[in-house]
Amino acid sequence: MSKLNMTPREIVAYLDEYIIGQKEAKKSIAIAFRNRYRRLQLEKSLQEEITPKNILMIGSTGVGKTEIARRIAKIMELPFVKVEASKYTEVGFVGRDVESMVRDLVNNSVLLVENEHKEKLKDKIEEAVIEKIAKKLLPPLPSGVSEEKKQEYANSLLKMQQRIAQGELDSREIEIEVRKKSIEIDSNVPPEILRVQENLIKVFHKEQDKVKKTLSVKEAKEALKAEISDTLLDSEAIKMEGLKRAESSGVIFIDEIDKIAVSSKEGSRQDPSKEGVQRDLLPIVEGSVVNTKYGSIKTEHILFIAAGAFHLSKPSDLIPELQGRFPLRVELENLTEEIMYMILTQTKTSIIKQYQALLKVEGVGIAFEDDAIKELAKLSYNANQKSEDIGARRLHTTIEKVLEDISFEAEDYSGQKVTITKELVQSKLEDLVADENLVKYIL
């Protein structure tokens, strides 16, 4: 199955392996992502006319909003960034401006493209690294030697390279020259300040500056890999491709959009800068040009997915212009006790499988009786009903509490198989769930 060419049905089938329920949300997002592919198959003139239909997801925390978008972006290898609306401030106030989310997307896109190019050149990079280390370990040939000596040296070099590749010489120490660590740039500042930062770095830090280090062969492989990668990769082409990919197929997931909605219930206590953030966000979602350290990017073809619980506000509390930019709305269902059970038993990388794998490292086998899993689902659901509803995240808390002693004393259980029963789950959790005050603080 081609990742970029996945049909909506294939996308939903993939999501079903990791996320239980939420059929409508999966369907809407699968169509939106498929339309990204469809648009790119059209003539350039028509491509410009078709803009993505942004999505507003409404649902409580822990019901799968972020996970749905993140999983699709990952499988389709699209530039993706998740941000929280509440972290941004209106232009002129202290804090991150909304344009920084686009700069973050471009950074992720360039990194994605760079990793793809590195993967293509993986064998070539490995060969160059091994050859360089082998030449360091073998003394160089003096000038004017016979052809026979040259051939002997070539054979010795080949054997040395084979031994390095097989890891036989990993513990040997060699002295190599490596580049000085580059100075970090804060990419979350306005472009003008970013350019000043880059110019200052050019003045105070020369790229060719190198220092001698004594490293093991294993460490030298990693140090040289990064250096040789930079020489073999076409950084300019990577930047251009990353910029283009972010522009045509980038996805920005804006979580907690409800936190910047101006609720009429809060009246005079409402933070006035919330509406300012919405107005700053509007041109980016509508389509504007944002300057990044890699160049300018147009935002009209970026897919925006906004999500929020909307407990204290309603989608209609967002400014009308912003509401209009999210024409597709999907309401996610709250998790039932049955769905909690299915999350524990039917997902590909369920929480139970994760904990079993973690404790297997210590030589501890963990088995859950079906009744124990049902009890976990029931008590997690009850805890959500009695205190803050945090959806599937509650399962992490309850399982952690049940396995706490086993995890702490793992060496005592090494080589054993521990069975988690319904009675054990009840003894660890039932008193806590029964006490509403304790639920708030412990679960």
From Swiss-Prot:
Gene3D superfamilies (UniProt xref): 1.10.8.60, P-loop containing nucleotide triphosphate hydrolases
GO MF annotation: an example: peptidase activity
Predominant location category: cytoplasm
Location in the cell: Cytoplasm
Coiled-coil ranges from the UniProt annotation: none
SMART domains: AAA, ClpB_D2-small
Record: residues binding ATP: 20, 62-67, 255, 321, 393
CDD domains: RecA-like_HslU (cd19498)
GO cellular component terms, semicolon-separated: HslUV protease complex
Keywords in alphabetical order: ATP-binding, Chaperone, Cytoplasm, Nucleotide-binding, Stress response
GO biological process: one example: proteolysis involved in protein catabolic process
Isomerase as UniProt keyword: no
UniProt family annotation: Belongs to the ClpX chaperone family. HslU subfamily.
Quaternary structure and partners: A double ring-shaped homohexamer of HslV is capped on each side by a ring-shaped HslU homohexamer. The assembly of the HslU/HslV complex is dependent on binding of ATP.
Protein task: ATPase subunit of a proteasome-like degradation complex; this subunit has chaperone activity. The binding of ATP and its subsequent hydrolysis by HslU are essential for unfolding of protein substrates subsequently hydrolyzed by HslV. HslU recognizes the N-terminal part of its protein substrates and unfolds these before they are guided to HslV for hydrolysis.
Protein name per Swiss-Prot or TrEMBL: ATP-dependent protease ATPase subunit HslU
Organism, as annotated: Helicobacter pylori (strain P12)
